[in-house]
């Protein structure tokens, strides 16, 4: 009888945890700028990650999007992918703030960076996109920061002044492992 009681109590505890939605905190997929990022969504070769507390993909502040480019295997095709994204940003009326390339060295392929701002009536978004070859495969890592509201231009300018160079540096130094992808 004692065994049955212990089983019933354990089952009740498991059942209560299940129905209340209680779960152990998930382990972060990676860390960027001292913030833990968690996988939120994937489709095809695109994967989106946000910090804890920013699970709502309709209203987030910080996001990292990882794009895999299966057809990109060398420096020329990586540059072509970066240029295609740059043209896409321009055709979307983004204000391109800066582009840069890190030249190839004997032990490291070239990399590319695009920093741009997208304005919409209800928000403004800054995007920093790094294009990199990892183990012979092309990726882009896009850190985006949003500010919501109709008058978000001045706050975004202030945010960019305070954070832009540091975000760019952190993104270009970031050691991402494709093993973090779902």
Each language-model region and where it sits:
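Bacterial N-terminal signal peptides that target proteins for export
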Residues: 1-8
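Bacterial N-terminal signal peptides
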Residues: 8-16
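Short N-terminal segments immediately surrounding and downstream of signal-peptide cleavage
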Residues: 23-40
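Secretory pathway targeting signatures of secreted, lumenal, and periplasmic proteins
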Residues: 35-73
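Sec/Tat-exported extracytoplasmic proteins
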Residues: 41, 89-93, 171, 175-178
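Ser/Thr-rich, low-complexity intrinsically disordered terminal regions
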Residues: 47-51, 107-117
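Mid-chain, structured segments of secreted extracytoplasmic proteins
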Residues: 65-105
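Short, well-structured beta-strand
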Residues: 111-182
């Amino acid at each position: 009888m004692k065994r049955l009681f212990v089983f019933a109590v354990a089952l009740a505890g498991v059942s209560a945890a299940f129905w209340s939605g209680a779960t152990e905190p998930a382990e972060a997929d990676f860390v960027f700028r001292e913030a833990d990022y968690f996988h939120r969504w994937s489709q095809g070769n695109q994967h989106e990650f946000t910090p804890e507390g920013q699970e709502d993909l309709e209203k987030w502040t910080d996001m990292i999007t990882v794009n895999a480019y299966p057809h990109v295997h060398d420096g020329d095709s990586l540059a072509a992918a970066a240029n295609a994204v740059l043209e896409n940003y321009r055709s979307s009326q983004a204000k391109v703030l800066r582009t840069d390339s890190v030249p190839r060295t004997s032990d490291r392929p070239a990399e590319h960076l695009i920093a741009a701002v997208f304005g919409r009536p209800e928000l403004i978004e800054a995007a920093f996109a790094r294009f990199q070859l990892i183990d012979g495969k092309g990726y882009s890592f896009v850190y985006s920061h949003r500010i919501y509201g109709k008058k978000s231009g001045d706050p975004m300018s202030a945010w960019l002044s305070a954070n832009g160079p540091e975000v760019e540096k952190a993104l270009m130094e970031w050691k991402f492992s494709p093993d973090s992808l779902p």
